Amino acid sequence: MIKLGIRVANSINSGRGHFERCFSVSNYFTSKIFWFLDEKNSFYENRIKDKDEIIYEEEVTEVSSMAKAVSENKINIILLDSYNIDINSISKLFKNIPLCVFRDTSKFLNVQMVICPHPISLDNNKNIVSLSGPKFAPISSKYINNQLCKKNKNINLLISMGAYDSLGITLNIIKSIKKLTKKVEKKIIT
């Protein structure tokens, strides 16, 4: 039986994307899930199912509560989605159970599975399961099945690059779209 522990960044500085990815995955599990969060926040607490257990780590870089749960056999697989935690040191700490991570870079990780929702090639060895590309983005089905909505013959697009766009990717996308057509309504919401 899978006993899943999810260590996810939910601090104010991390944005909601990490939690949303893990929450989408959690909907596929009927068994109890142990959630290891950075800090208390009623928004996240209210979304996590009653059958699940929420445990708060002391710091955003901390995993001691999760390590305790592993030693007590409460969890036997870890899903990790946080930029604040050094994944390679985590993989050494939890070498006896599978470790699956969400990643947004192609950097090599010594884990059992890497999920990257971006269309990049991952630098992993053949012993690591690598799932890369938009089809592996855990998106809720309520968003996937939406119909294209046209207003006044204009096509409305939502471009979301997460909380931080230090490389200016959003503006590059908008510039590319502007070249394709003049019928695009542009709104940047941060």
Range-by-range predicted roles:
Residues N110-L167:
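A nucleotide-sugar donor-handling region in carbohydrate enzymes
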Residues I6-F29, D38-S130:
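Active-site and donor-binding regions of nucleotide-sugar-utilizing enzymes
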Residues K68-A69, R103-S106, N145-K150, I177:
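Short, flexible, glycine/charge-rich loop motifs used to bind or transfer phosphoryl groups or to couple energy/partner
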Residues K32-K40, K186-T190:
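Short internal beta-strands
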Residues N152-T190:
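Donor-nucleotide binding loops and adjacent catalytic segments primarily
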Residues M1-G5:
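Extreme N-terminal starter segment of soluble prokaryotic enzymes
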Residues V25-K32, S176-T181:
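A short, Lys/Arg-enriched amphipathic alpha-helix followed by its capping loop at the start of a domain
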